[in-house]
Regions:
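Residue-level recognition of single "structural anchor" positions
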Residues: 1-266
């Protein structure tokens, strides 16, 4: 944000204020538009980042850093629509928040795939009961010769598909699309780069930046395979949104009371 303030010669406080207003407007856009989603296959995953400092340094850091922060997403495998996002820790409570929100946004029964994170089990049961075809894709990892301190994951040596509830179709038990979206998110926002000094300093601003990204990804970005935006593919909008429309929406909200927004920390 400081680079933007230097380029356009305005105060960093002005840029920060715009980020907050944009985040709140985009959060409300998602909340209002992404409802009664007709989907057949949903994939869920969570991606790591940090705010202030990494978790191992929180105890000795100055100020009140948040430490590790996880962004959970549920994506429609067919339209690539991000149905539900949530920002929090990696606990069961965050999984419950994601699944409860996902349930409320769906119009029909779906096939659901997650990774093997145990927090999903109780969360899916609590949100959907038996009204879901749910499976976990569990990856198995082998030893790696890479020394300690590496930033790449261990080598995946195999996968196991485990039915949890209902009758999931094994050939559609996958997390490939949500993992690819995680990569797009990490490459689109420098806050998410692993080795960076551009990490978020406040969790609220972290969430506002994510809300802006989700609005761009969902409503204004043409997916290369779909040839339309995910929102258009899902039938929740009838046109490709422009950034000018997003900006006008921000201006229209400036005089109105702010809502709780799209995503919240656990």
């Amino acid at each position: 944000m400081r680079s933007i303030s230097r380029v356009v010669d305005v105060s960093i406080n002005t840029v920060t204020k715009l980020l907050v207003e944009a985040g709140e407007a985009c959060a409300n856009l998602h909340d209002a538009q992404v409802q009664d989603v007709k989907a057949s296959k949903i994939q869920c995953d969570e991606i790591w980042s940090f705010v202030g400092t990494k978790q191992k340094n929180v105890a000795t850091a100055k100020g009140e850093p948040e430490g590790d922060v996880w962004t959970w997403t549920a994506i429609d495998a067919d339209t690539k629509l991000i149905v539900s996002p949530f920002v929090g820790d990696r606990s069961g409570q965050s999984a419950i928040a994601l699944m409860d929100d996902l349930r409320d946004r769906l119009a029909n029964r779906v096939q659901l795939t997650t990774d093997g994170h145990k927090a999903y089990l109780e969360a899916v049961e609590g949100a959907f009961g038996g009204d879901v075809d749910y499976a976990q894709l569990i990856k198995m990892y082998g030893p790696t010769p890479t020394p300690a301190g590496r930033y790449s994951p261990a080598e995946c040596t195999g996968i196991k598909k485990v039915r949890v509830e209902g009758d999931p179709d094994r050939k559609h038990v996958s997390t490939s699309y949500v993992e690819r979206q995680n990569l797009t998110m990490r490459m689109s926002m420098r806050r998410f780069t692993r080795l960076t000094n551009a990490f978020s300093k406040k969790v609220d601003n972290h969430m506002h930046a994510l809300s802006l990204y989700f609005a761009f990804y969902t409503f204004t970005r043409i997916h290369k395979t779909l040839k339309v935006s995910p929102a258009k593919a899902a039938g929740i909008t009838d046109h490709l949104w422009s950034m000018e429309e997003i900006a006008e929406m921000i201006e229209a909200r400036q005089a109105k009371p702010m809502s709780a927004g799209l995503i919240s920390s656990g």
